[in-house]
């Protein structure tokens, strides 16, 4: 039985506070703080051949965020237990070969952590190089604040959701968000990198971007290979003068930008990064 048949005709499961339940079973009350206030965090993880990719970076970010929010992770909410439950759920949902997993952690009434794990099959195309390149623009209707919460993957995700809808309406692939200084901080579902004169530029965390897992992984990998990576303030002028522009996240890895408005980019360095750094994470062999 194919996973396509399995998905279409039901039978999917989730994990709620360590307990396997049917995906369509109600699990939250109207008093849930994540539902009412966005009082929680989430991680979007990629599972490949039964392994949770970049798991240590995901859980480091998650537990750091819970500490900041004052949400207590009890003994049954640990990185090792969550990782094991993610793997079990992927197996149960028949998507351990390649899956998108969402782990949502929210504040219970006693300030302890409650959580939900969802796992669905991921199309193999998500592993591949985006040959045609993406198009991008700036989302004009929101500004992110540059506070300590800006770097979190918060369930209060409204500016990003609105930016994704705006991109769909405009027929473009991604929208970039500005901070309250009118500088670029990140994309609606990505972090942004620019390549200019053999240097890599990305918005610093103090600029309000999400502390992306693939962003961190790639910066370390580039530095280990001797490249200069500059975390700085990124304005539209730098975007216009750069030779290459690409986006990163944990699911798609890397996506090169073909155009930003009238600006056209090349992808020579970006494709090399994909082949040498990103693809080996997910692919046993390369085309």
Task: For each feature predicted by the language model, list its residue ranges.
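Helix-start/capping segments and mature chain N-termini
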Residues: 5-88, 106-108, 112-287
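Short secondary-structure junctions
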Residues: 90-99, 226-227
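Ordered, amphipathic secondary-structure segments that act as subunit-interaction surfaces
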Residues: 95-105, 112
């Amino acid at each position: 039985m194919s996973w396509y048949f399995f998905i279409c005709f039901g039978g999917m499961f989730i994990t709620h506070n360590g307990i396997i339940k049917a995906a369509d079973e109600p699990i939250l009350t109207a008093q849930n703080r994540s539902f009412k206030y966005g009082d929680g965090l989430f991680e979007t993880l990629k599972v490949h051949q039964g392994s949770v990719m970049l798991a240590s970076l995901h859980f480091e970010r998650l537990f750091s965020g819970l500490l900041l929010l004052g949400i207590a992770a009890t003994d049954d909410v640990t990185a090792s237990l969550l990782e094991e439950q993610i793997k079990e759920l992927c197996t149960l949902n028949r998507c351990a070969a390649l899956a998108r997993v969402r782990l949502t952690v929210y504040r219970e009434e006693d300030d302890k952590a409650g959580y939900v794990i969802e796992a669905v099959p991921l199309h193999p195309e998500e592993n591949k190089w985006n040959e045609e390149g993406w198009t991008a623009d700036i989302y004009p209707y929101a500004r992110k604040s540059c506070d300590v919460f800006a770097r979190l993957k918060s369930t209060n995700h409204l500016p990003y959701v609105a930016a994704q809808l705006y991109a769909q309406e405009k027929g473009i692939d991604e929208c970039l968000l500005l901070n309250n200084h009118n500088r670029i901080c990140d994309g609606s579902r990505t972090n942004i990198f620019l390549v200019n004169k053999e240097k890599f530029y990305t918005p610093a965390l103090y600029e309000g971007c999400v502390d992306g897992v693939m962003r961190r992984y790639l910066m370390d990998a580039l530095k280990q290979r001797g490249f200069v990576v500059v975390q700085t303030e990124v304005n539209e002028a730098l975007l216009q003068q750069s030779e290459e522009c690409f986006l990163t996240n944990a699911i798609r890895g890397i996506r090169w930008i073909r155009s930003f408005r009238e600006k056209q980019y090349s992808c020579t360095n970006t494709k090399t990064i994909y082949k040498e750094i990103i693809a080996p994470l997910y692919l046993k062999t390369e085309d």
